[in-house]
Amino acid sequence: KINAGNIDLIYANPFDAATLIREKGYRAIARPVGKSDEMVIAAAEKSAINTLEDLSKGATVAMADNRDVKLIGLRLLEAVDLEESDLNWEVTENYQAAARKVIKDEAQAAMFLAEVFHGLSRLTKMQLTVLIESDLATISHVLLVKDGFDKEDELTQAVLDFHKDDEGKATLTELGMAEGFEAMSEEDAEFMIDLMETLQ
């Protein structure tokens, strides 16, 4: 939790961003281009679970410790009348470990950050069946600045121009944000926060 009010710039996940904007005096200035926080629910390819409907109460779901993924996943599971308390949750060290649990039949399903899922090895993905992938394009990590930060305009411009030189491009690619950042309006941030609140 971020309680210190002396941090001027924060790159936050959508849930933390909501709290920081509503309660801690931060404003969104930018978000990565084409990089929304989608998630995937998958089961073992060899199991009898081929659709979300096949998941039943008492099933074990493996996942890395990621609140964003879990909340979006729970919203998707509402469609098949499953709530958090209906399932057993196995928190793994990382997403690869969650995939292994499902493949070894130690869990009936796993939740993944979509980007991580699509980056798994071909061999791993061949052993998994995607039950559903979220499509909430408006939800993403955001760059926040503290109200009253005196260099906000310069900083915003620097962030938006970061991809324009080779060094910046290389850094962004390393961070998985090859296309850089785009400006984010207060309206866009409010819309995202409202959406996050409906997920909680």
Regions inferred by a protein language model and the residue ranges of each:
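Sec-exported extracytoplasmic/periplasmic mature domains
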Residues: 3, 22, 60, 78, ...
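A ligand-binding cleft/hinge motif common to bilobed small-molecule-binding domains
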Residues: 11-23, 75, 103-127
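Stable alpha-helical elements in mature extracytoplasmic
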Residues: 16, 51, 69, 98, ...
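Bilobed "Venus flytrap"/periplasmic-binding protein-like clamshell domains
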Residues: 36-100, 104, 115
